[in-house]
From Swiss-Prot:
Primary location class: cytoplasm
NCBIfam families named in the record: PRK04860.1
Top-level taxon: Bacteria
Listed name of the protein: Protein SprT
PANTHER family for the chain: PROTEIN SPRT
Organism of this sequence: Pseudomonas aeruginosa (strain UCBPP-PA14)
Length: 165
C-alpha cells in the first residue's frame, strides 16, 4: 500500500524541483491519521500524514489529488515561508501551475462514522428520565463522580443498558 503513495510523493517533488530548478528535502511519510482528514502536512516537521482508510477506499483520486495537495503545502512553506495562508495564492499556484490540479481545499470522500456507545442512566422523573452517557462520562461515574437530574435533583443511576449506534 505505501509503495504507490511514496512513489506519488516522490513524483510530486520531482515535478516541483523541475519547475523551480532547485531541490527540496523529502518529508517523512506516515499512515497514522484517522477520522475525517485525508491528509495533513506538518510544515515545521516536514512530515506528511495520510489516512489509510480513506486511501484504501479512494485510491486513484487520493494518489492524484490528496498527495499533491499535501506536498504542495510543504513546497509552499519551503519556498515562501511560514507567513502564507494555508490555501492561499502560493499554494494555489503550485496546485495549478505545477500539478495541473484544481486547488480544492477539502475532499469529498465518504467518511464512515465510527460506532458510538452510550450508557443509559435514569432518574425518578415521570417523563424525560433517560440520559445517554458517553464512555468518558460513564468512566467518571465509575470513579465516583455524580450527576443529578435538573428537574427532580435525584442522582442519575446506571440502568445497565448499553446502546450501540
Amino acid at each position: 500500500m505505501p509503495e504507490h503513495l511514496n512513489a506519488r510523493v516522490e513524483a510530486c517533488y520531482r515535478q516541483a524541483e523541475h519547475f523551480f530548478q532547485r531541490s527540496f528535502p523529502r518529508p517523512t511519510v506516515s499512515f497514522r491519521l484517522r477520522g475525517q482528514k485525508a491528509g495533513v502536512a506538518h510544515l515545521d516537521e516536514n512530515l506528511l500524514r495520510f489516512n489509510p482508510q480513506l486511501y484504501r477506499e479512494n485510491r486513484e483520486h487520493f494518489l492524484e489529488q490528496t498527495v499533491a495537495h499535501e506536498v504542495a503545502h510543504l513546497i509552499a512553506h519551503q519556498l515562501f515561508g511560514p507567513r502564507i495562508r494555508p490555501h492561499g495564492e502560493e499554494w494555489q499556484l503550485i496546485m495549478r501551475g505545477i500539478y495541473g490540479l484544481p486547488p480544492d481545499r477539502c475532499h469529498t470522500y465518504a467518511v464512515k462514522r465510527r460506532a458510538t456507545t452510550r450508557y443509559l442512566y435514569r432518574c425518578h422523573c415521570p417523563e424525560h428520565n433517560e440520559f445517554p452517557f458517553s464512555p468518558q462520562r460513564h468512566t467518571l461515574v465509575a470513579k465516583g463522580r455524580r450527576y443529578y437530574c435538573r428537574r427532580c435533583k435525584a442522582t442519575l443511576v446506571f440502568t445497565g443498558e448499553v446502546l450501540r449506534e
